[in-house]
């Protein structure tokens, strides 16, 4: 028997409940999220502007950082305004198309960030382990190629999710205990098998774990090269050049790890803890990345002070 209309097959809208169990304090939870959103916007925009306008920062490492800033600006803007709408104005309803759109952009920018972090790890590996080859390997053409690969792989991993969800019937199920839209959050509501969705999701996670493995291997090689240097002063200087990148990786991976860990093994943990950790996963990296690079990278710090505060260094 044919489906009567698309609305019966795909419910017209969903309800994002926010953080279940903490509804009474939603309005107060919104303030720290608003604060970190402002920090993410101002910090990433400032660093992106500085890299774009300062000729001395037109180097591979800073091009990668500019890509990271663009991704962080996009990721935070794709998630936090909707969260604030739920927390402050009780705007919980989102259309089916709106859900798919937000889900697409959240996963797309998350995958892109993972790839850019791999590129930044490769940049540090070449700079420390193969310094004489640095300018020959990491040319502007190679950086453009990395950016293209990041976009194409993200599309390859995320576009199928949209079509995997479009094929599912939801039978009127529309309540989602979350603050933003993600693939399995809606797939679980389907009144049909989601085995294909789960298998594709596991494949995507495997690719992201491969990114993590590449980052770890590059840093093992970096540490080996650093501790082969003749003096402690040279070792500390080399380690300092990697400090910002390691901080960014920890900001990206730590909330994701705890969110994944609690979902897999924390069955007795209250649901609001799961949702809160998932929120940190999309909020913390865009907020901390500009702070980490602004504080730890002397060249960026001095350039920001000179441009925005008219100080001489």
From Swiss-Prot:
Topological domain spans for side Cytoplasmic: 49-56, 123-141, 219-238, 296-313
Extracellular side: 1-27, 78-101, 163-198, 260-274
Keywords assigned: Cell membrane, G-protein coupled receptor, Glycoprotein, Membrane, Olfaction, Receptor, Sensory transduction, Transducer, Transmembrane, Transmembrane helix
PROSITE patterns, A to Z: G_PROTEIN_RECEP_F1_1, G_PROTEIN_RECEP_F1_2
Predominant cellular place of this UniProt entry's protein: membrane
Listed Gene3D superfamilies: Rhodopsin 7-helix transmembrane proteins
Glycan attachment points: 5
Superkingdom per UniProt: Eukaryota
Residues passing through the membrane, by range: 28-48, 57-77, 102-122, 142-162, 199-218, 239-259, 275-295
Localization annotation: Cell membrane
Cellular component annotations (GO), alphabetically ordered: plasma membrane
Pfam families on file: 7tm_4
InterPro entries recorded: GPCR_Rhodpsn, GPCR_Rhodpsn_7TM, Olfact_rcpt, OR51/52/56-like
Membrane topology according to the record: Multi-pass membrane protein
A molecular-function term among this protein's GO annotations: G protein-coupled receptor activity
Family: Belongs to the G-protein coupled receptor 1 family.
Function statement: Odorant receptor.
Name this polypeptide is given: Olfactory receptor 52E6
Gene giving rise to this polypeptide: OR52E6
